[in-house]
Curated annotation (Swiss-Prot):
A Pfam entry, by short name: SelK_SelG
Residues annotated as site: Cleavage: 81-82
Annotated protein name in UniProt: Selenoprotein K
Gene Ontology MF annotations: identical protein binding
One CC-aspect GO term: endoplasmic reticulum membrane
Positions of the UniProt region annotated as Disordered: 48-94
General function of this protein: Required for Ca(2+) flux in immune cells and plays a role in T-cell proliferation and in T-cell and neutrophil migration. Involved in endoplasmic reticulum-associated degradation (ERAD) of soluble glycosylated proteins. Required for palmitoylation and cell surface expression of CD36 and involved in macrophage uptake of low-density lipoprotein and in foam cell formation. Together with ZDHHC6, required for palmitoylation of ITPR1 in immune cells, leading to regulate ITPR1 stability and function. Plays a role in protection of cells from ER stress-induced apoptosis.
Originating gene: Selenok
Species for this entry: Rattus norvegicus (Rat)
Complex and partners: Interacts with DERL1, DERL2, DERL3 and SELENOS. The SELENOK-SELENOS complex interacts with VCP. Interacts with ZDHHC6.
Length: 94
């Protein structure tokens, strides 16, 4: 990539990819990745930590947990409005 520095046109391809600043930046990038990875594994309760709600105002303090999903209904979708579908065998509906 071409860039301008102090009024001169420079090409970054001339610089070695193994210069000291690249190696140190790469090391700190890996170190930060590892730190953030383990922070996300160990700190699952982000909402309480950020002040979205404490343990005193939680609705599920007695260990019950939130309610489960409702049972799944099988069959046709009956809550949509519109014409009924044609018969499975086809035809013109006479």
């Amino acid at each position: 990539m071409v860039y301008i520095s102090n009024g001169q046109v420079l090409d970054s391809r001339n610089q070695s990819p193994w210069r000291l600043s690249f190696i140190t930046d790469f090391f700190w990038g890996i170190a930060e990745f590892v730190v953030f990875f383990f922070k996300t594994l160990l700190q699952q309760d982000v909402k309480k930590r950020r002040g979205y709600g404490g343990s005193s105002d939680s609705r599920y303090d007695d260990g019950r947990g939130p309610p489960g999903n409702p049972p799944r209904r099988m069959g046709r979708i009956s809550h949509l409005r519109g014409p009924s579908p044609p018969p499975m065998a086809g035809g013109u509906g006479r």
